[in-house]
Amino acid sequence: MIFPISEIPDKVTHSILEGVSALQNMSHTAFWSTVLGFLVVARIAVILATPKRRVLDIKGKKVVISGGSQGAGAALAELCYTKGANVVIVSRTVSKLEAQVQKIVTKHEPVFEGQTIRYISADLTKEEEAIRVFSEETMPAPPDVIFSCAGAAETGFILDFKASQLARAFSTNYLSALFFVHAGTTRMAKEPISPKNPRYVAIFSSVLAFYPLLGYGQYCASKAAVRSLIDSLRVEALPFNIRVVGVFPGNFQSEGFEEENKSKPEITRQIEGPSQAISAEECAKIVFAQMEKGGQMITTDLIGWILQSIALSSSPRSFSLLQIPLAIFMCIFSPVWNAFVNRDVRKYFHANTEYVTRHQRGGVGSENPTPQ
């Protein structure tokens, strides 16, 4: 209900008018200092009011990992097993799954009697396969933690790929995550547990979801879709006591990383600069350590955290008192950086005319036509 201003008590009216007058007389510097001070105090109040996060304890819990036969998924499987989890790894290739399970059980003793690690072979780009993984027949008890790690990057220029290759990239990176997480979260929601023990769904996207890079066009688009999935599911899962975590790794050593480097355009290497890839094991340790601290938007290096500040959106912040001012700075700096990148790209294609000439003639690339 809205009251006419004449009905507001005189003292209140006088106070409001005084406040407006004070704002009008305040200098721009003083005004923005006041606003910034208010925001800082408000953020500190939110931090103090936030309940203390519980440590993620997976001993005796069921952890299901897609892409668990190699790369970060395999490293997470080994790490979780050493922490006492009952691990299930999921991938398509049975031979790789068997080798990974054998490697882990040979290398590590069980943390407790009866601890298990097993595999399920499934093509997660198919909805029915993802549903089978989490069915009661395949998995009698629901998972406590899910890691969605499956994915692959195929480098090159978008115009050089056939439509079938573009669709394959989206299927490999987005649909596999969507179907796997949808089936797993649905199973979790069906069988709720105590609010004191939240379940976890950690979904791997990429730092390139924040800042697309020439030569990774189709990969960036699919990983940006995964980032939107993370933000959407994070809110939808709240009523079921499921904590959704987004993981945005930079480069890490894996079979996939070696493959993507084989077709990476030279201009992409120039823009990237010297980027040291961490090991898959180090990536897994960083991700798990951040989850233990309650992190919901996890990056694996400083560059990733900086790039995240360009695309904060409605996602949870990481070290927000530092990240918000950084975001303001990056809004100013990014156009300058883009100007230098665009200059380098024009110089590259001026010197390498085959790509432009081919497409001006209406040619569509072969399986890997991108100039090196």
From Swiss-Prot:
Gene Ontology molecular function terms on file: 3-dehydrosphinganine reductase activity; NADPH binding
Membrane topology term: Single-pass membrane protein
Keywords tagged on the record: Endoplasmic reticulum, Lipid metabolism, Membrane, NADP, Nucleotide-binding, Oxidoreductase, Sphingolipid metabolism, Transmembrane, Transmembrane helix
Protein EC: 1.1.1.102
Domain of life: Eukaryota
Subcellular location: Endoplasmic reticulum membrane
InterPro entries tied to this protein: KDSR-like, NAD(P)-bd_dom_sf, Sc_DH/Rdtase_CS, SDR_fam
UniProt protein name: 3-ketodihydrosphingosine reductase TSC10
